[in-house]
Amino acid sequence: MTTPVLEVKDLHVAYGKVEALHGASITVGAGQIVTVIGPNGAGKSTMLNAIAGALGANASAQGAVLLRGADVKAWPVEERVAQGMSLVPESRDLFTTMSVEDNLLLGSYTRYKRGEKDWRAQLDVVYDLFPRLRERRTQAAGTMSGGERQMVAVGRALMARPALLMLDEPSLGLAPLIVKEIFRIIVRLKETGVAILLVEQNARAALQAADYAYVLETGDVVMEGPAAQLANDPKVIETYLGLNKKSA
């Protein structure tokens, strides 16, 4: 049996005495898009931050997070990145006064630090995925549109050549046409073999792109299955796709 790229088992996360995740378990395989959908406050971003090791000092986590079979719970963020885990946060966190290319190169810092001689070579891969970024590589990131900034954020994460790419609300604040473009690129990334964990409130777009889906509500995984199956589930249709059963 092939080892999953990511396996999360019985993950609990608490902020002080308040538990935000109640034993969540998910699996993502190579070349697979897995999405987690759910309402605001369900714990979706908390889950990603726990996997990435980016929880704040006031948070505690219990459970197992396995990256290609290795338990990463004790690893700092930098080591998780070095071993193949990249997170694109909801806030994108670009250095707005730096150029597009300099922002991208920051994504390969761990590879540079480890002495990899081809640490810049991934730029061509990113520019092939995002031709617009090649055209604007000298432009300050802060002058880009929202969609272009999201492309920079995804491209920066890809500079680490991750085995697992995690995306937190990639469609947030973007125009519908740009959302379609971003999701087309996400599907293209799947074809490269990278495992993708997608947290998204745009349930329709997420389920169309994903292979497998989980529904998270108030810290609990309440439903899971093939994305196409969940997209036709009456409860998902009514609650997350904005349709009633008759119109569906």
Predicted regions and their residues:
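Glycine-rich phosphate-binding loops of nucleotide-dependent enzymes
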Residues: 2-248
